[in-house]
Amino acid sequence: MLYYVLVFLVVALVAGALGFGGIAGASAGIAQILFFVFLALLVISLIASAIRKA
């Protein structure tokens, strides 16, 4: 149980450091681009799967 507390503490410290630093704005822009790229890949995969089954 103490292991999980330490892991979550480290994750929270890293998230806080990145959130309060200047990296947050750049990371948000990159995350938006990656979201739309993977959304497009999902749609292409679903269409290819539907065509393959038909």
Curated annotation (Swiss-Prot):
Cellular localisation: Cell membrane
UniProt main location, coarse: membrane
Transmembrane residue ranges: 5-25, 29-48
Domain of life: Bacteria
UniProt keyword list: Cell membrane, Membrane, Transmembrane, Transmembrane helix
Database matches in Pfam families: DUF1328
Record's keyword annotation contains Cell membrane: yes
GO-annotated cellular components: plasma membrane
Topology in the lipid bilayer: Multi-pass membrane protein
Protein family: Belongs to the UPF0391 family.
Protein name: UPF0391 membrane protein BAB1_1670
Phylogenetic classification of the source organism: Bacteria, Pseudomonadati, Pseudomonadota, Alphaproteobacteria, Hyphomicrobiales
